[in-house]
């Protein structure tokens, strides 16, 4: 289970504002990458908080609402859309989202973040001091909190897109390459939220605005 060891170590080293950052949605064929940045106060406590991939959708939803309403949680969330992903590539788009989430968090609460904990490897040219923590969402509570906010926010966005593009079933697979999604892609072609740099979407050469 994640805990506050990384956050506490950063504070012991003299850092005041320690921020956890994580993303959701790097792999899907459609929709945005969602990135959240979270600061947890030292006295933060929320039983059951874990890596978003290890808990049920219902539990994630419960934890999401508890987190965003928690007095000891400061957070910000951003989305990088499919067009930007296609323009930059998925890795650079994700890194852009991480930087934007941290900057939004600073602006939202009028603070200066002095240390970030990022899920995964360190990010080149990141605008703030940081460390990468491989599988950090299972080790750091602030990264775990960010993973839940990023994931649930993205699922909510994909449910909205499902109403706009009902033929794809986004509410069921959130844009991932399931059998149902692939069948719909071949039947209807891609829509404007599909990532045209991703296979097999790239193979379907229909005009961008045809659906």
Positions of the model-derived regions?
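RNase H-like, Mg2+-dependent phosphodiesterase core
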Residues: 1-211
């Amino acid at each position: 289970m994640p805990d506050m060891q990384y956050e506490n170590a950063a504070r012991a080293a003299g850092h005041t504002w320690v921020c956890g950052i994580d993303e959701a949605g790097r792999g899907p064929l459609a929709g945005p990458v969602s990135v959240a940045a979270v600061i947890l106060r030292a006295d933060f406590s929320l039983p059951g908080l874990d890596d978003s991939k290890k808990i049920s959708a219902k539990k994630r939803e419960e934890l999401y609402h508890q987190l965003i309403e928690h007095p000891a949680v400061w957070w910000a969330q951003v989305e990088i859309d499919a067009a930007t992903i296609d323009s930059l590539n998925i890795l650079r788009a994700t890194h852009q989202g991480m930087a934007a989430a941290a900057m939004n968090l600073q602006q939202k609460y009028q603070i200066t973040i002095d240390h970030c904990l990022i899920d995964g490897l360190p990010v080149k040219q990141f605008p703030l001091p940081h460390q990468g923590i491989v599988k950090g969402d299972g080790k750091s509570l602030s990264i775990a909190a960010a993973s839940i906010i990023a994931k649930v926010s993205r699922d909510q966005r994909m449910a909205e897109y499902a109403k706009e593009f009902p033929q794809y079933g986004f509410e069921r697979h959130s844009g991932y390459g399931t059998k149902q999604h692939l069948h719909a892609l071949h039947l209807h072609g891609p829509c404007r939220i599909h990532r045209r740099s991703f296979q097999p979407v790239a193979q379907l050469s229909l005009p961008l605005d045809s659906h």
